[in-house]
Amino acid sequence: MTPLLPDPEHYLYNLIAMTSSDAKRLWRRSIKEHFDYTCVYCGKTYDLSQLSIDHVHPRSRGGKDTLSNVVCACKGCNQDKGSNNWLTWMRAKFGITQREQLILKHIN
């Protein structure tokens, strides 16, 4: 299992990765592992190729590449959410769910 570190740079500092692209790849994989390959939005489990990393607070709106701002999402949910507010989008798409608490716990 890949260790879950705060951001890609920590993989370089801890000599787990030798290049920044390797560090980012390891960081993304560790996030998917942390969420058990399950989309935080729809709650379905996928194989690695169908998952992506979503910025809860989109980078286009000032969100950072930090552990507290990224979650595991299926490509469909990630694309559908786009740069919308995650909570507004999630409630419109799925209603109020227990998964909200999972996300809130992770980002706070």
Each PLM stretch: what is its role?
Residues D22-L51, C74:
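Short cysteine-rich loop/turn motifs with clustered Cys
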Residues Y41-C72, K81-T88, A92-K93:
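Histidine-centered nuclease catalytic patch
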Residues Y11-L12, T19-D22, D36-Y37, D54, ...:
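General secondary-structure edge motif
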Residues A17, P58-R59, G76:
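General structural signal for alpha-helix termini and helix-helix connectors
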Residues S21, R25, R29, N78, ...:
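Short alpha-helical segments used as structural interaction elements across diverse proteins
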Residues L67-G82, R99-N108:
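Short Fe-S-cluster ligation motifs
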